[in-house]
Amino acid sequence: MTDITPEASLRSLINSTTHKWIFVGGKGGVGKTTSSCSIAIQMALAQPTKQFLLISTDPAHNLSDAFNEKFGKDARKVTGMDNLSCMEIDPSAALKDVNDMAIANGGDDDGLSGLLQGGALADLTGSIPGIDEALSFMEVMKHIKKQEQGDGEHFDTVIFDTAPTGHTLRFLQLPTTLTKVLDKFGAIAGRLGPMLNSFAGNPNVDVLGKMNELKESVQKIKKQFTDPDLTTFVCVCISEFLSLYETERLIQELISYDMDVNSIIVNQLLFAESDKEHNCKRCQARWKMQKKYLSQIDELYEDFHIVKMPLCAGEIRGLENLKKFSCFLNNKYDPETDGELVYQLEQGL
């Protein structure tokens, strides 16, 4: 416990020069995409000489909707920003790419795609529960490998717009789960090597070698994910019971994974006391409820950076609106002085 109250902003993260991986997650419908876009924009504006990549790992992609432009499975620059790119992982397309790459390379690729080289393993892969998370994890592995080899565009920091909590936890469990599976599988792989190679669809594929290669990559990612200087998780919630409950569960799980988590974004706050023009009883009642849970958040997470974001009447879409809204991550929102800006966002001005 520290005697210093953490700043009610993400300024330290936005200006961080060490973080390589930033995960943004929480319960469905709490504003994860808007928050991840806002973090990515603010980091790109604060550090114009660095390159940032925003990846959506949510099967229901929203980055294209948020920026009002189409993104796909390949990283593409956000129109109007020279150092921010976006991509949306499509599980079915990614799986096809993996199989095509493995077959074309004849096994000369990363460990996981090598194991999927045609045959029965490839047929089974598409129906495996959690394949979306596995393919997202593969993108991380691919990114690390490219950075090490100097291939493709270099990104200093990758921000993940994650799926709802359950999917995200499965994704973050993958390094530990894969390590355990590979350890157990490796114990018998020596005796079953030829059989495994045949099962993979190509007797020339060294399954045991691919497994060891995969294990090394997974351990490297796990080490980075548990380094607080390299990786952090930003929780997003709204000031309601179910969201607060799920946020606490998420934080406890992250702590059990040894992942750094010290920031919470609370979205959709009414700040009704400052709305002098409209005396809305329903708004006042809801704000009273929000304040109750806000006080619990402040008490439970007194050593966290807690950022309180206002509710806008309309959706926050397009780069310019996202820029305006995201500034409240850097400078605490003041309903007395910043209310006009929120009104402009509501009107789409």
Curated annotation (Swiss-Prot):
Please tell me whether the keyword Nucleotide-binding is annotated for this protein. yes
- What's an example of a GO molecular-function annotation for this chain? protein folding chaperone
Keywords associated with the record: ATP-binding, Cytoplasm, Endoplasmic reticulum, Golgi apparatus, Hydrolase, Metal-binding, Nucleotide-binding, Transport, Zinc
A Pfam family cross-referenced in the UniProt record is ArsA_ATPase
Q: Which GO terms describe its biological process?
A: cellular response to oxidative stress; pheromone-dependent signal transduction involved in conjugation with cellular fusion; post-translational protein targeting to endoplasmic reticulum membrane; response to heat; response to metal ion; retrograde vesicle-mediated transport, Golgi to endoplasmic reticulum; tail-anchored membrane protein insertion into ER membrane
| GO cellular component entries | GET complex; Golgi apparatus
* CDD domains recorded: ArsA
Name the NCBIfam families on file. GET3_arsA_TRC40
Assembly, in brief, is: Homodimer. Component of the Golgi to ER traffic (GET) complex, which is composed of GET1, GET2 and GET3. Within the complex, GET1 and GET2 form a heterotetramer which is stabilized by phosphatidylinositol binding and which binds to the GET3 homodimer. Interacts with the chloride channel protein GEF1.
Checking HAMAP family in the record gives: Asna1_Get3
Protein's name according to its UniProt entry: ATPase GET3
Q: Upper taxonomic classification of the species? A: Eukaryota, Fungi, Dikarya, Ascomycota, Saccharomycotina
Q: What gene does the UniProt entry assign to this protein?
A: GET3
